[in-house]
Amino acid sequence: MTESDPSIQVNPDDACDNFPYVMFEDMFGARVETIALQSLEIGSNVAGSVVDAWAHVLNGDPKFSIPGMPRRLFCVHTAVVDWMLSLETDPDGGRVSAFECGLKSSLAGRHHLLDLRAFDMVFVTMLEGDHYYLVVFDLEAECMHLVDHLGDRGSGALLRDDDSYIMKSTPFKVKDIFVDYLKLVNHPKATAMQASLIMREDLPWSTTRRIVAPFVESGIFAMRHMEQFVGSRRSFFCGFSVHGARKKVQCNYLRKRYAAEIMLSPVNKYGDVIRRRLQFV
């Protein structure tokens, strides 16, 4: 959201006995256990719950709104899961119902926003194996973007459409689910988004599968892309070097930064508790 929403403010006095076993929890129960947050340590694959916590921070902390830029919604990575992609037929609308549940989790109780009319862009975080990438729906510009740290030759996130759902590549399956949801809520951009194409972002800092442990930094790239990407409204520059060693140093720095941002965010009910304890370290 681009404006401060009082519904996401938390009372530090409400902190419960889950701390320090839980390091992040918002007022609607989205949480990150300490053991999961440790996946931000150097050399570890980032846990899905950590990427989800970052989505909640971006959604709820007004300091991450960009003046003059689109209103963005960041979905938890469980908004689209494996069974939704492998289900050949869906006569009962199970895929759309599951996606709606993911939106409810992402909106942290703000169900009045489920029609998505308050947003210009919707970010769907995908996790396939250990590979994170983003499928971004730009409702304002009526287009879609695939943002993936792996280059098009090394990525499993292919762009292949087909009349048969099961033959589509994952980004096009996500598009089908999203468009069906727009139709369900009578969104005015449903028809335009159905006709839109998916554009793969060309990233100078992209990585390849040829490097050792190609997915270790995948979550970090996704979190940085979530933070910085606003479509074609401005040049997409994340500050990443094109050189592997320098890029690794930058990812290590971002691991520390994101750990601090998540724990000290105003949407974290334990934020003030953590600040007080840090004063005595």
Specify the residue positions occupied by each region the protein language model found:
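Enzymes acting in ubiquitin/UBL processing and closely related pathways
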Residues: 1-281
